[in-house]
């Protein structure tokens, strides 16, 4: 087995055996379950009125009880929830050895640092995409059980593209989370970075600059602020790509040259 294959296998085993990815998946599952509850409330206005604030929240979040509204809710949940839960997974993957003080043992293995970092990024990408696909599948099941109207194969196909596209725009930006978790040698600095980018993304979107701020693009793509054609341009996607590449390159550079004996 090559050094890269060994690193990938080790990272995969760590992910499978840890409860962190499972808890992230459970947390992500709350989105379609809550969406199904909102649809159920909106389908029964008499019962909804007796629920007071819950009914009001459902109207604000979803609006109407149909598949388009349900899919929109899921897409926006992937943008908001993904920014947090994908970051938690990334922080754990890159920060665990520093918090456990086992990074020196990791680097003592006959495997290049580049192979280790690549393996970590691959595990993050595969797991976060798997989480997204799971949420879409769970959403289909929940929506079918609630029996909401407006279903069509074309709508489901469009929703799948929107949800997957939102995730694909979010996942590469985790490269900066990986960098901060590595340079900060633990979890807390990366958590701080995640909160900072969420706050700045909301401010940028409100100020009308979201299309120029990489961390605001996934939320705008999800339709949280209106039709994406009115919010985003080609430059928005280019900025996400460039920012992600900068974070990726900086992470590789840091792992290659940093003194890991401290």
Regions found by a protein language model. Give the residues of each.
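Junction motif at the cytosolic side of a transmembrane helix
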Residues: 14, 242-262
